């Protein structure tokens, strides 16, 4: 593990595959409740052709954040990823984001396309506005309510109870109970970040946002509602 001092914060990251002579840097950005460890199972395949650089976003493991303050937000994480890439010894980079990390990477590509060679969105998170979703209705989304219920339980000190609310609502009843010990511990290590996510005012994804992305891009198959975000992003991005 290494660190880069980014926007007043020491961002921890893994840098794997450089010794193999790989010339294509791939920066991997994790999603909610995760950290750089989430990529462990795919480092082998990825490092066959890439130098993989996987940061942990601000306030995620190995940091143990108390949930206090206003320094956890999508905007802050976008700023941090941009500054992180700027400090690397090689660029442009391929940028891959999973879930909430996909949303962050999408915003990075909007703001700083000069830093990127390719954008990969894996099950990207984010809510769609009326220009992309005819069924859009203003107001809090069901996801926001789920995050709030989970975060409030975590803030009261019931880490496992809060994580169970989140996982079971997102993936189905019994998901938390069935989860193996290792991924459970990673979620516990990052549980307080849901307190910050509850307060995050993440902007909706729009048709104009997607049309602004000009770089080569790729995206994985994803379940609803992430599938809608993925398809809309791909549909409206110019070739």
Per-range role (PLM):
Residues 91-133:
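Conserved hydrolase catalytic core segment
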Residues 169, 193-209, 226:
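Active-site nucleophile elbow and catalytic-triad environment of alpha/beta-hydrolase enzymes
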Residues 155-195:
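Conserved alpha/beta-hydrolase catalytic His-Asp/Glu region
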Residues 1-10:
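N-terminal cap/lid segment of alpha/beta-hydrolase-fold proteins
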Residues 122-156:
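A catalytic-pocket lid/entrance helix-loop region that shapes and gates access to the active site
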Residues 75-93:
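Conserved acidic catalytic loop of the alpha/beta-hydrolase fold
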Residues 44, 207-239:
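Conserved loop-alpha-helix segment in the C-terminal half of the alpha/beta-hydrolase fold
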Residues 9-70, 84, 91:
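Conserved HGGG/HGGXW glycine-rich cap/lid loop of the alpha/beta-hydrolase fold
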């Amino acid at each position: 593990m290494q660190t880069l001092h980014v926007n007043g914060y020491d961002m921890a990251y893994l840098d794997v595959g450089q010794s193999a002579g790989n010339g294509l840097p791939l920066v991997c950005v994790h999603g909610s409740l995760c950290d750089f460890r989430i990529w462990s199972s795919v480092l082998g395949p990825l490092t066959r052709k890439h130098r993989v650089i996987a940061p942990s976003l601000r306030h995620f493991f190995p940091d143990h954040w108390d949930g206090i303050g206003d320094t956890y937000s999508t905007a802050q994480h976008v700023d941090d990823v941009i500054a992180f890439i700027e400090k690397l010894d090689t660029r442009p980079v391929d940028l891959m984001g999973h879930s909430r990390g996909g949303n962050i990477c999408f915003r990075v590509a909007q703001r700083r396309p000069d830093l990127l060679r390719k954008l990969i969105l894996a099950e990207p998170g984010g809510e769609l506005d009326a220009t992309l979703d005819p069924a859009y209705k203003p107001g809090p989304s069901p996801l926001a309510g789920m995050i709030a219920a989970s975060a409030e339980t975590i803030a009261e000190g019931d880490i496992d109870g809060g994580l169970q609310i989140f996982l079971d609502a997102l993936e189905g009843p019994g998901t938390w109970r069935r989860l193996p010990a290792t991924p459970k511990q990673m979620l516990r290590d990052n549980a307080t970040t849901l307190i910050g996510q509850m307060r995050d005012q993440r902007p909706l994804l729009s048709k104009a946002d997607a049309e602004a992305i000009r770089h080569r891009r790729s995206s994985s198959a994803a379940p609803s509602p992430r599938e809608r975000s993925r398809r809309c992003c791909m549909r409206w991005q110019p070739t």
